[in-house]
Amino acid sequence: LDAFAARAASARLAGRSLDLQYYMWHDDLVGHLLAREVYAAAERGVRVRLLLDDINTKGLDPALLALDAHPNIEVRLYNPFRNRSGVWRLLEMVQRFFSVNHRMHNKAWIADGRVALVGGRNIGDEYFDANRSVNFRDLDMLLLGPAVADASAIFDDFWNSSAAVPIEALNPQTPENLHRLVAALAHESADAAAQVYLGRVAASPSAQRLTNHELVPHWSANITVASDPPQKTKGADRRGWLQPRLAAHLDGMHREVLLISPYFVPGKQGTATLLGLARGGTRVGVVTNSLAANDVPAVHSGYERYRDRLLDGGVSLFEIGRHGPVATHGLFGSSGASLHTKAFVIDGARGFVGSFNLDPRSANLNTEMGVLFDDPGLARDLRQEYLRLAAPVLSYAVRRGADGSTQWLDRSTQPPQVLEHEPDTSWWLRTTTRAISWLPIESQL
């Protein structure tokens, strides 16, 4: 709710520009409400630049073309498909697999070059507590000051790269009538479901402080926004990539390394790094999704391959549960929750919040971005978030049994209950996930 309020408020207060960079912008309630805020800003004379990855825009061309028709709005798509719909788009995915497999996973909302929201959220109901079934727990950082210039420079690099193509150059169709689209957005924002959601946003105490300009910022001189380059996969030079920069933070001796990653596939190198830290006396902890909470079971299969090795090496693993008291409650009362936060904190002093999953896809295929900080106050807050996620009410502690089996400890009951298989899953889901783990697809996870 607060994340929605921050974006809506920044759009309403913008006077010059809105630069929006996202992997996904869903055709749903939240997507429509924020699109209406963007349109309203453009109507006031604000220049809007919207950069979306093209992998999830199927069926959105009419609406995007309509927005692009506004004189103050320009829409570009990253690494777009030449075929815009139907079976031809699917065939192109097969024919150009190695090319279209590289996606822009960045997420940034920048207003007037003065305020930036950077983190792990896409735009859609499940990212803003408005989904009836599953909502994602996610984390953003709201930035003011010099760090915003970093985010703006990253946006400009992507916007001006050859990978970002104006949507009007891709689709010869006549754009949907802008006035018709605006009328539809206005009608939806006035209906009962939208009003219930907007009422919940307005009732949030922190959202009220935000809109009343009562939030007190935390000032720090040690915050930077970092990103992969737009053409990440072109050439062998990895010096500008985000992954080596993040890995460098794990080098050396540490007291504590705490990781939060919804999609956790450490691979051989990452596993060796974490085990090396644990052997050296570092407390290493990881919070990730359980199989039941993971919306991509194939990714869980990649994690499963390394889980026992990490446990045997002294790494603490916690898996977020899906049901019961762990669930958040969206517009219609969601039945579950899934972790989507991507962050780490080291020695209670420095850390990262962004879009980077600890998996091969983030490391090698997608472009990613996030906020790096060296600040005990911010690190303390992020460490508290880790501890909250790892707490008994939200997650299962994973351990090895006396017989060498993998066990899940439900610490929310007294006495704690020991589970012998993946919690809240069917035999079929466990079996298919195990079968997927045998496939040579780790590089794509």
Description of each model-found segment:
Residues 1-107, 111-445:
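Charged, low-complexity intrinsically disordered terminal segments
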